[in-house]
């Protein structure tokens, strides 16, 4: 066996003066960090991923987890991450997997954008005393409305009434511009999905199925679910397409642009096998491209095929990763008869991605939103398609800024998981999530109570919604529609001229 030259990333300490040997830590840890030996608890720090399950559950607060303060020899080129990756690949000969989004110290542009507020000459609006409209419609909007007048006889009198002549495309109605992103059944547990489904139903918004199909337990919430068609076509049939309120074609993902999804066979249980329509225990590997899409014309054919299969009653979205030519791709999507384009930034999370893709491929979501919105406006197509932004949305201010940059709504994924208890340890792909979120092991899944999870996620969405109303009021705006693409209300701090140009905003003080 080839030895590992990588020291433990974290140091686990159990205070013997506080520990009462209840062995709760040995039960709660799914990684095998703890073992009792006589009258003490032994910890194996090399197995710890800092998921904090043991820390939270310890009744005596006896456990401490710290980053292992090892003094690596400093070098301007060969940083610690580069050396650790080489050690691991020299040991395994494999592609390194990771979870979550880009972990490099690239700029987070949301943090370099500040918001405007009204003062004196342009008074603010008090959302506690005046109505604020956050309702959002996702789908095609007509350029103009045409009416025709028809005569109706009422009480013996002929009266002319205006009747809408323009045909309105199907739209999704959101009570808040926050949706829960596509995370598949298989990558996440059924209890995690039930938590999300109950929460979005309560909040009047939507969640995505991911590419893992729709388990029957979620059928009661289908009115608040967006189904997904990915390159693997897992679980896709007419019943699946008809169940959801909309359909999303997944072309790319922000955490791993250019490649397909991967669900390890150990996560493919009998239930997931039935839902995905694949053999139990087999790896679910999606192809990198859709093998029936090699051009915008091919994409248009799939969009129309899905609309025809659902009797033209459901909007169809197309999801792409935020890449260099995203604006040109978005124009093509807008002309393909799709109703919305979903742009996923490189900070977007994932259950499993090659580390080299996660950390080096794609562009920031902030740049992609602004560039796509501007290009669609220049082409006269902005009303033809909605923009949904995802990938690195952490708080209500990020939602507000994303919409001001040009999005209609946002998806949140990691934030929703954190609400359930996720510690962002990045080891989702192992299937050993101690919080019952990214696992299929029954003894771990049952740790997540769907009722409690739903309450936590709904509380998060409601809290963000209240904060967005407050921010709108401070900006003197009473409708989320008036914020969309309103980049005049944004200013940049510490950005160069080119960055400001791409974002379409001015520097602070201008």
Swiss-Prot record:
Positions of [4Fe-4S] cluster 2 binding: 29, 48, 51, 54
The protein's required cofactors: FMN
Catalysed reaction equations from the record: 2 L-glutamate + NADP(+) = L-glutamine + 2-oxoglutarate + NADPH + H(+)
Alphabetical list of SUPFAM superfamilies matching this protein: 4Fe-4S ferredoxins (SSF54862), FMN-linked oxidoreductases (SSF51395)
CDD domains: GltS_FMN
Pfam families xref list: Glu_synthase
Coiled-coil parts of chain: none
Binding annotation for [4Fe-4S] cluster 1: 19, 22, 25, 58
Keyword Amino-acid biosynthesis: yes
Gene Ontology molecular function: any one: metal ion binding
Similarity annotation: Belongs to the glutamate synthase family.
Name of the protein this chain belongs to: Archaeal glutamate synthase [NADPH]
């Amino acid at each position: 066996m080839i030895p590992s030259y990588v020291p433990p990333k974290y140091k686990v300490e159990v205070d013997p003066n506080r520990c009462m040997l209840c062995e709760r830590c040995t039960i709660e840890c799914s990684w095998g960090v703890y073992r009792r030996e006589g009258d003490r608890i032994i910890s194996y720090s090399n197995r710890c991923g800092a998921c904090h399950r043991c820390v939270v559950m310890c009744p005596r607060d006896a456990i401490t987890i710290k980053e292992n303060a090892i003094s690596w020899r400093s070098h301007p080129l060969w940083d610690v991450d580069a050396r650790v990756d080489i050690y691991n690949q020299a040991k395994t000969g494999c592609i390194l997997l990771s979870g979550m989004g880009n972990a490099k110290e690239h700029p987070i542009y949301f943090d370099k954008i500040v918001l405007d507020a009204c003062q004196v000459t342009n008074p603010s609006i008090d959302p506690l005393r005046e109505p604020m409209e956050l309702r959002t419609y996702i789908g095609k909007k007509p350029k103009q409305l045409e009416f025709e007048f028809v005569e109706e006889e009422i009480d013996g009198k002929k009266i002319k009434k205006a009747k809408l002549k323009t045909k309105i495309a199907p739209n999704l109605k959101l009570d808040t511009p926050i949706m829960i992103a596509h995370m598949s059944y298989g990558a996440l547990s059924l209890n995690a999905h039930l938590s999300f489904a109950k929460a979005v139903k309560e909040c009047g918004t939507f969640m995505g199925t991911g590419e893992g199909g729709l388990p029957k337990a979620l059928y009661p919430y289908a009115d608040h679910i967006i189904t997904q068609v990915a390159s693997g076509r897992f679980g896709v049939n007419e019943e699946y397409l008809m169940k959801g309120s909309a359909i999303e074609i997944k072309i790319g993902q922000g955490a791993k642009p250019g490649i397909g999804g991967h669900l390890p066979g150990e996560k493919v249980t009998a239930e997931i096998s039935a839902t995905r329509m694949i053999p139990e225990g087999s790896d679910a590997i999606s192809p990198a491209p859709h093998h029936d899409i090699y051009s915008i014309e091919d994409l248009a054919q799939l969009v129309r095929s899905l609309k025809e299969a659902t009797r033209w009653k459901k909007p169809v979205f197309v999801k792409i990763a935020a890449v260099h030519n995203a604006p040109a791709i978005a124009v093509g999507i807008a002309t393909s008869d799709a109703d919305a384009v979903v742009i996923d930034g490189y900070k977007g999370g994932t259950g499993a991605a090659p580390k080299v893709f996660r950390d080096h491929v794609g562009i920031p979501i902030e740049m992609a939103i602004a560039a796509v919105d501007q290009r669609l406006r220049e082409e006269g197509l902005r009303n033809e398609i909605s923009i949904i932004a995802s990938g690195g949305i952490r708080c209500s201010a990020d939602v507000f800024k994303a919409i001001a940059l040009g999005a209609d709504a946002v998806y949140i994924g990691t934030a929703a998981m954190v609400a359930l208890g996720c510690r962002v340890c990045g080891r989702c792909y192992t299937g050993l999530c101690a919080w019952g979120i990214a696992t299929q092991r029954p003894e771990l899944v049952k740790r997540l109570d769907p009722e409690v999870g739903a309450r936590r996620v709904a509380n998060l969405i409601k809290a963000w919604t209240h904060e967005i109303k407050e921010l709108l009021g401070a900006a003197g705006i009473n409708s989320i529609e008036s914020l969309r693409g309103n980049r005049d209300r944004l200013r940049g701090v510490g950005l160069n001229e080119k960055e400001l140009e791409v974002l379409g905003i001015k520097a602070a003080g201008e």
